[in-house]
Design a protein with these regions (language model features):
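Hydrophobic beta-strand segments within beta-rich accessory/binding domains
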Residues: 70-86, 93-94, 127-131
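Cleavable N-terminal signal peptides
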Residues: 2-3, 13
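Extracellular and analogous surface-interaction loops
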Residues: 63, 67-78, 118-123
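Extracellular beta-rich ligand/substrate-recognition surface
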Residues: 56-66, 107-110
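Noncatalytic accessory or regulatory domains flanking protease catalytic cores in secreted, cell-surface
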Residues: 94-145
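Solvent-exposed coil/turn segments that connect beta secondary-structure elements
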Residues: 76, 87-89, 96-100, 134, ...
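Sec/Tat signal peptide C-region and signal peptidase I cleavage site
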Residues: 9-16
C-alpha cells in the first residue's frame, strides 16, 4: 500500500486546461486549423514529466507547469509533424498523449534551433503540448504548426 501511495504522489499532476487553449483536428484539416500561437514562459523542467520519450530522445527545456496547448485528434493520423517557429530561438517540445504514458519530445530541426516532432501513429485522442526554452523564464513568442503527411 505504501508503494502505491508513493507512486501516486510522485507522479506529476498534469492539468486539463491549456495556457493558450484547445484545438481540434480531423483528417484533411486546412493549415489554419493546425496553426496556433503562444509564448514560452516558466521555470518548470520538462524532464519532470519524462526524462526520455518513447524513442529514447531526451526531454529537455523549461516551460509552464500547465500545457501550452491541448490538441484533440478526432481521427487517427498515420504521420504528422509539429513544428515551432519562434524566429530561430532555441525551443523544445514535449507532447503527452493520447494517454499519460505516451511521450514525444523534440529539439532542434536540422540547422534551425526551433523544435519539431515528426512521427507516425498519432492515435485519436487528447494531446498536451508544452513549448519550452533552454533558459528558465525566457519569454519567446512562437507559432506552432501541425501538418499531416
Amino acid at each position: 500500500l505504501l508503494a502505491i501511495l508513493t507512486a501516486i504522489t510522485a507522479t506529476p499532476v498534469i492539468a486539463e486546461t491549456a495556457n493558450f487553449g484547445t484545438f481540434n483536428l480531423s483528417t484533411n484539416f486546412n493549415p489554419a486549423q493546425g496553426t496556433v500561437q503562444g509564448f514560452t514562459r516558466g521555470s518548470y523542467s520538462l524532464s519532470a514529466i519524462s526524462n526520455r520519450d518513447r524513442d529514447q530522445k531526451a526531454c529537455i527545456g523549461f516551460a509552464d507547469p500547465n500545457p501550452d496547448h491541448i490538441m484533440v485528434l478526432e481521427k487517427d493520423f498515420p504521420q504528422m509533424t509539429i513544428q515551432v517557429d519562434s524566429n530561430g530561438n532555441d525551443t523544445t517540445l514535449l507532447i503527452q498523449g493520447p494517454d499519460q504514458t505516451t511521450i514525444r519530445c523534440g529539439d532542434d530541426t536540422g540547422k534551425s534551433k526551433d523544435a519539431s516532432i515528426s512521427d507516425r501513429n498519432w492515435k485519436r485522442g487528447t494531446y498536451r503540448i508544452w513549448v519550452g526554452t533552454f533558459n528558465p523564464g525566457a519569454k519567446r513568442d512562437y507559432t506552432l504548426q501541425v501538418e499531416q503527411q
